[in-house]
């Protein structure tokens, strides 16, 4: 719905004028002054007025420090008067008398803090060493405090809302401390060093506060590190000196072990092992140690002598000893002389020689093998036949073939 007159400039000008006239009309109405009649028995100001049922009017209350001297009527309001000495009224009232001031009773354990006036009663408190006993949130009398001393690290806890003298000591909460012995001791929070721009020197406990100190300067920390390094070096040097004085041989052995094989260098070659005295060398040089060998005559090789046969039978043992020798031993060969050289447990052959391996029963010859030598001109003794310990020239018996015993051949292989 449109209001052309209200939206027009003339309507906007009339608005403030109408509001001012309404305020004047309200102010011009007569204000209700007690005593005044009212229909619902409810006065306008409940704190400072009261309803008088005898006259069916609302009357004024007396202010603090006064009492009702004359009751109101339909034509007259309440008449108030100041309370006499040693009496008081603390609130707005319609009482006909004032309350009597009550002094602080020493017998009950009280002492006076502020005297009684017409608008306030005397203010009392318990004497030192005593505490209040409350009843309906009012201290009725005082009693001596119980001698319950809370030790450091604990605090007093009120367990009874009526009697605050019933205390119990409980441990302080984490982050709090208490360092006195008192029945009213309370735990306090630990000091926070970082808030004060300090560093913590010692942490707080339940019975002590946190200890703070100024932050150390960088120069002091550097000096401390240098001194600590020097102390450790001197301590290490002292320990080494004591160990050298008490155990010099052990220290020398340790130094020898450290210097024997430096890192990155090869260990020196080990000396050649000595020949075992219990197993003497069985190989003897077959050719002279010096001088060149004379060229062998052309033609088939001659029959091996008895020493050559014995040497060939002993060759497996010599070969086994050569396998056990160190690699360095094989390199120790005398150069510039032809022949067979024996060094330790090794046999070195220089020059052209023929080796007779002896007859092998049932064996086959290869294409590169030398021609078979003729059979020896002497027979081999029969198996089990007794003979002298020294070598002698055997004789062939009639009707027997030239051969070597099979057991002798197998015996050489077993060696």
Swiss-Prot record:
The modification Phosphoserine is found at residue 315. Keywords: Apoptosis, Disulfide bond, Glycoprotein, Membrane, Phosphoprotein, Receptor, Repeat, Signal, Transmembrane, Transmembrane helix. It comes from the Eukaryota. Residues 245-415 are cytoplasmic. Disulfide bonds join 43-58, 59-72, 62-80, 83-98, 101-116, 104-124, 126-132, 139-150, 142-169, 172-187. Residues 1-30 form the signal peptide. Residues 261-304, 361-399 are annotated as: Disordered. It is found in: Membrane. SUPFAM superfamilies: TNF receptor-like. TNFR-Cys repeats lie at residues 42-81, 82-124, 125-170, 171-213. GO terms for biological process: apoptotic process; cellular response to mechanical stimulus; immune response; lymph node development; myeloid dendritic cell differentiation; positive regulation of canonical NF-kappaB signal transduction; positive regulation of extrinsic apoptotic signaling pathway; positive regulation of JNK cascade. It is a single-pass type I membrane protein. Glycans are attached at residues 40, 179. Residues 368-380 have a biased composition (Pro residues). Its main location: membrane. The chain crosses the membrane at residues 224-244. GO terms for molecular function: identical protein binding; ubiquitin protein ligase binding. Residues 31-223 are extracellular. GO terms for cellular component: Golgi apparatus; plasma membrane. Aedes aegypti lymphotoxin beta receptor inhibitor reduces dimerization and trimerization of LTBR induced by lymphotoxin (LTA(3)). Self-associates; dimerization and trimerization are promoted by lymphotoxin (LTA(3)). Associates with TRAF3. Associates with TRAF4. Associates with TRAF5. Receptor for the heterotrimeric lymphotoxin containing LTA and LTB, and for TNFS14/LIGHT. Activates NF-kappa-B signaling upon stimulation with lymphotoxin. Promotes apoptosis via TRAF3 and TRAF5. May play a role in the development of lymphoid organs. This is Tumor necrosis factor receptor superfamily member 3.
């Amino acid at each position: 719905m449109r209001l052309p007159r209200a939206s027009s400039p003339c309507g906007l000008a009339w608005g403030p004028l109408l509001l001012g006239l309404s305020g004047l009309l309200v102010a011009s109405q007569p204000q209700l002054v007690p005593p005044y009649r009212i229909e619902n028995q409810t006065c306008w100001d409940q704190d400072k007025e009261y309803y008088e049922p005898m006259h069916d009017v609302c009357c004024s209350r007396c202010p603090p420090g006064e009492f009702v001297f004359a009751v109101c009527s339909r034509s007259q309001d309440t008449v108030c008067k100041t309370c006499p000495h040693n009496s008081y009224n603390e609130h707005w009232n319609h009482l006909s008398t004032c309350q009597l001031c009550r002094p602080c009773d020493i017998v009950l354990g009280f002492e006076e803090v502020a005297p009684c006036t017409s608008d306030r009663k005397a203010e009392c408190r318990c004497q030192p060493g005593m505490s209040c006993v409350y009843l309906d949130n009012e201290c009725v009398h005082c009693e001596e405090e119980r001698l319950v001393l809370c030790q450091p690290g604990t605090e007093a806890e009120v367990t009874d809302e009526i009697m605050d003298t019933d205390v119990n000591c409980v441990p302080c909460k984490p982050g709090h401390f208490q360092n006195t012995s008192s029945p009213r001791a309370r735990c306090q929070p630990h000091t926070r060093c970082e808030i004060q721009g300090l560093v913590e020197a010692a942490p707080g406990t339940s019975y002590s506060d946190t200890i703070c100190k100024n932050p150390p300067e960088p120069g002091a920390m550097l000096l401390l590190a240098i001194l600590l390094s020097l102390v450790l070096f001197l301590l290490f040097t002292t320990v080494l000196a004591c160990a050298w004085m008490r155990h010099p041989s052990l220290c020398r052995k340790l130094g020898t072990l450290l210097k024997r094989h430096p890192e990155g260098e090869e260990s020196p070659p080990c000396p050649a092992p000595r020949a075992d005295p219990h197993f003497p060398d069985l190989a003897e040089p077959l050719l002279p140690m010096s001088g060149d060998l004379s060229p062998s005559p052309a033609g088939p090789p001659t029959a091996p002598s008895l020493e050559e046969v014995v040497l060939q039978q002993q060759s497996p043992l010599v070969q086994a000893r050569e396998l056990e020798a160190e690699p360095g031993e094989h390199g120790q060969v005398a150069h510039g002389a032809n022949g067979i050289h024996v060094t330790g447990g090794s046999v070195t052959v220089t020059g052209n020689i023929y080796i007779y391996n002896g007859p092998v029963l049932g064996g086959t010859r290869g294409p590169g093998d030398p021609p078979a030598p003729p059979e020896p001109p002497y027979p081999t003794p029969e198996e089990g036949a007794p003979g002298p310990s020294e070598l002698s020239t055997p004789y062939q018996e009639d009707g027997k073939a030239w051969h070597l015993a099979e057991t002798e051949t197998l015996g050489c292989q077993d060696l």
